[in-house]
Amino acid sequence: MYRFCKGLRNCLQWKKSTFNLYNTPQMENVTLKRIAEVLGLSISTVSRALKNHPDISTATKKRVNEIAEFLDYEPNINAINLRAKSNRVLGLIVPTISGFFYDSFIAAVEEECRLNDYRLMILQSGNDPQIEINNLSICRQNRVSGLFVCLSINTNSMAAFDKFKEADIPLIFFDKVPDGENYNKVCIADMEAAKMAAAMLIEKKKKKILSLFGSKSLSISRRRLEAYNNVMLREQDVVIDVEHCSSTQEARNITKQYFSKKEKPDAVFCMSDEILIGVMKSLNEMKIDIPSKAGVISLSDGFLPSIYTPEITYIETSGYKLGKLAFTRMMNCMDNKNEPVELFTNSPFVSGGSL
């Protein structure tokens, strides 16, 4: 008891010394060595006590943990990783964090990281290929154990990504993915979702449809357009106007352009939430009644359609489900099941009042 009280007194004196005359904290990391000095124990005993080692008595564990908590001790993760020759950090690069799809994807991955004792480092590319390359460099410098990437719309070279493959670091592409069979990819069931939307427009007897897709450079846009056209082009009395847009503002401008014409569309298909925002902004500004004057259907994560009146009919493209699938694939890759595969989530139809 005397030894513990003496240790606590030393601890209080040391903690007091970390504050200057103006009570401003002088940042000093609490180490195992410092805790050992305070308690008069060896560093190895302190370390094992904090790890709840069976060779350490309950009383000693209690003393060590109380002092560690009092001093706000935090383990040195870098030192632990160095000893274990591993780094339980995963990187995640997205074009932007804002946006319901990416938010929900990140939430799912972060949730799984927490449950599996990983940390997550999130970086934004802003759809700038140079920033994307810089982010890859940051991930390599931090020795991430694996990396999730949604490509920027302007990515035109995979050379920087291939360095991760050469270093045997698992790399999972999601949503906006590269062409080819040499990469691990997790995707929404793009083609099925687009087919479902096209079939629903036909079922609702829409005849002149403004169809808005993402950038032509993205495989996700090309796949969705191909599947959509395969359904639509079988209908000889249906006119589809296909446009590509890479931003909400561009979608807004295109929608305004088409609904300013004498022969207006009677429906709009939106390939993504980003496009849907621009479309709805324009239709509301022009006072186009939905669905009597124009129907709207979108591929969506599901949150955005619920904020409009009437609610938007959509095909679900869940970022949360995709995030869960991506993490599972990452764990499989780390278990040496790293042969490139392309996995898909399902895309259910959700009826609103907009069609």
Model-derived features with residue positions:
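Short helix-capping segments at alpha-helix termini
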Residues: 115-116, 167, 232-238, 261-264, ...
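Flexible loop/turn connectors
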Residues: 9-12, 256, 260-355
